[in-house]
A protein has these predicted regions:
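N-terminal loops that bind phosphate or other acidic moieties
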Residues: 1-112, 116
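Residues that scaffold, gate, or flank divalent-cation-dependent active/transport sites
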Residues: 120
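Conserved small/polar residues in nucleotide/adenosyl-binding loops
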Residues: 126-128
Length: 128
C-alpha cells in the first residue's frame, strides 16, 4: 500500500553538509514532491510515512543559507538519493514484479504532466 502523499514509507537521510534548518526543510519538501510523492504501488494511500533528513554540519563547507549555487548542488545530490530510494521502494512494493516509469514530454506544465502520468500508472487495465 504505497501511494504517497506519502504512504507506508520511512526514509532517513543523513548528511554532514552545513546547511540552515530553513534551507534543509525547503530542499526536502520540494524534493519529496518530485520523488516519493510520485510513487504508486497499488493506488491506495496509507497514513504511515515519514521522510527525515538530518545534517550535522561537519563537512566543513560554507554554511548554506541562501538558494545559491551550493544550495542547488545540495538539492541535486538530495534528488539523486531520494530518486534512487523512491524507485527501490516501488520495486520492493507488495507483490511488485515489475517497475514502470512514466515520462510525459512536451506538457504545458509540470502539474499537467504529473496528473497525466498518475492517471496512466493508476490504470488497472494496463498489463505489462
Amino acid at each position: 500500500m504505497i501511494h504517497p502523499n506519502m504512504g507506508t514509507m520511512l526514509s532517513f537521510i543523513t548528511t554532514d553538509c552545513a546547511i540552515t534548518h530553513e534551507m534543509l526543510t525547503d530542499a526536502l519538501q520540494e524534493n519529496v514532491k518530485k520523488t516519493y510523492n510520485r510513487v504508486t504501488v497499488d493506488g491506495d494511500t496509507s497514513t504511515n510515512d515519514m521522510c527525515i533528513v538530518l545534517a550535522n554540519g561537519m563537512a566543513g563547507n560554507t554554511l548554506i543559507e541562501w538558494q545559491d549555487e551550493e544550495y542547488q548542488a545540495f538539492c541535486k545530490a538530495l534528488n539523486e538519493v531520494n530518486t534512487r530510494l523512491a524507485r527501490q521502494i516501488a520495486a520492493d512494493g507488495e507483490g511488485a514484479t515489475k517497475l514502470v516509469t512514466c515520462t510525459v514530454k512536451n506538457s504545458r506544465s509540470e502539474e499537467t504532466a504529473e496528473r497525466l502520468a498518475k492517471a496512466v500508472v493508476g490504470l488497472s487495465l494496463i498489463h505489462i
